[in-house]
């Protein structure tokens, strides 16, 4: 396996580990701070799918219960995709497209909650855009080297 192919696989693995760890960190109460008074979701609101577990991971990234679960799933898929070149390439391409669209949605005020399910505003926008750019580079831009074909014709 050549270096370019391994780079695609390592990209899927690193993004997978990053998202799995961030998703798991969202369940650690000491790493999630409550929103400020008068914030996007007041602490005293009735629980719904959006406000369940809402807080700021590391004080920076808005998150909630569903967002943490999605990050763990996306991360797990990346870790599994690492096992093959085709899987890693497909993961990197799909991740780049999906997370670029999510970053764009985060810039639009009407879509900053992923249709009322997950927060994608604030620091989530640049984080999603940055990871989409990295995955896009390894999924689309970096040339994929294939094994040279062997000439199997009989010699005369």
Task: Give the predicted meaning of each segment.
Residues 1-156:
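Membrane-interface extramembranous regions
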